[in-house]
Amino acid sequence: MSLEDELLQQRIPVALKKQMTPGPTVYTLENRRGRWVNIFGRLKPGIAPAQAKASLQPLFHSILEMEVQQQEFSRASAYTREEFLRSTVEVLPGSRGGALLGTMAGAPLWVLMALVGLVLLIACANVANLLMARAGGRRKEIAVRLAVGARRSRLVRQLMVESLLMAICGGAAGTLLAYWADRFLVSFLPSDIPVRLSGAPDPRVLAFALAASVLTGIVFGLAPALQATRVDLHSALKEEGAAIAGGGHARLRKLLVVTQMALSLLLLIGAGLFIRSLRNLGSLDPGFRTANVVVFSVDPSLSGYTGPQTQLFYRQLTEKLRALPEVESASLGLVRVLDFGEWDSTVTVEGYEAKPGEDMNPFYNGVSPGYFATLGIPMMEGRDFTAADAGGARKVGIVNQKFARRYFGDRSPVGRHFGFGGDPGIKTDIEIVGVVKDAVYQNLRDPIPRQVFVPYEQRNNFPSMTVYARTRLDPRRAQAAIRGIVHGMDPNLPIYDMRTLATQVELSLIFDRMVAFLATVFGALATLLAAVGLYGVMAYSVARRTREIGLRMALGASNRTIVWLVMREALLLFGAGAAIALPCAWGLTRLLRAQLYGIAPGDPLSLALATLALAAAAALSGYVPAFRAARIDPIGALKYE
């Protein structure tokens, strides 16, 4: 699977940035703090990226120290200055790129790679067990070959070739399955991300699959091959020495089953943790009502609108949307909720003395009147913005509960003032007229931030706005009417990222959902492989112990006794695997802490449920051979060779 950038269709001089995005923005060549340009350079031979970073960091830090002396930093708080000076330069291989998708999906993909590795180990252990069982059936054949002069090394090579052929065929089948699965995985990603996942065969992936197949075939085929050629010719030629004990392979085969059980339990525990984490995120109250809301973005500056024209366009747009019979209310917001973006700004709060280095940068959003009603965010105190606030004669703002608690404690913030900026002479001329309930901002995982809302027309430096429309019916059915209003006002104005707010919430959980689903699939697959491996060992053991079982039954052992004899061995193998896995899980799941939400890595319920699930699979795998053992005819068993 590879990434294909759909946005990079043309290359233009960076000096044309203003002409390509004519609206006001911080991402300009003149703004020294707006970092939006990536610098590409070719390193000298023998120079690693880490060495280049070590050389560039002192130069970068000197540039930062020079920048904080500029006039535009005069209003910045001490916290902003300190955070700015802590910035570091990043030197990355060009092949990795700087895509947002890679940044967001990096950690989840590493988790999935670890899970895939565990499944591969379980599958390899299973195949090794099957090879050993097959070698046991060929014990006399191998003994005859050795007896007539065949070299052991030649027999090992023959068995290794068989193992490699099996591994390569399995790798080829897996590659075909992966090609089909790629298309299924793409369905987890939103269709409007600026990259496209291609399922076309990649030579590097194919080479890795071939190398992994050959390597696993060698590593996990060598031990069975060596074990198969290490035979006692005298006993093997007489077909003796294994009828009761199960053969010299028994201990190694049981060890492989114990390993499979341990790894499967680790996967099931991980799957349980991810499922419960996703459930916690899905049941989280975002602070607003997601049902029946359509959200989209427009940028009138792309059609040549200026500042006053832009404000008029937005006023007319919201009025026309509210007039639609399908729409209950409509409003604007500068920052789209749950879009992984943010805008913060340094503030000075009236009557609050900031401590040295204290974070005075709440998240900021410019909104229109009715924004909170449209999103369903309750007003806890004071009032909403009105059309009269747009003029700017009286600067007003609304804060959330966390902002109010942080700077005003138990006192009411309504009627108090704050200002944007951190220098001692800043004017605190923005009056707080309301307090709204806390709501999420960037994504569901982050703690609720301190938030400041102002009328977008008072600080409208950005023509691109997000439009929210609460509908009276299914929002998907209202989208056509909403598009008609926008295109009726300006047929050439593009509409970006139109979707329902519920879909926006779902997209914010896209990687959590993908990891939880795939972890569950891998856990189920691992359990199936481990169960098959245990069944194979127990069936082989019952076949080898046919005479013993017949003798026990002839001496009076009941069917229940025979069933328990086999079941006990199966449960002991499971117990040994669980005894290894549970302490390991207690430590290894700590590595997943950053990927979990609302659940401890060592959650007892997840550990217990995973253990019970695997115990049930182990019991079922042991019961089938046990049931067959109980149906053995004692007379026929005593004649068994």
Regions found by a protein language model. Give the residues of each.
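Alpha-helical transmembrane segments of integral membrane proteins
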Residues: 97-101, 130-157, 161, 181-305, ...
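Short juxtamembrane loops and helix-capping segments at transmembrane helix boundaries
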Residues: 2-25, 68-73, 93-100, 151, ...
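C-terminal transmembrane helical bundles of large multi-pass transporters
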Residues: 445, 481, 485, 489-582, ...
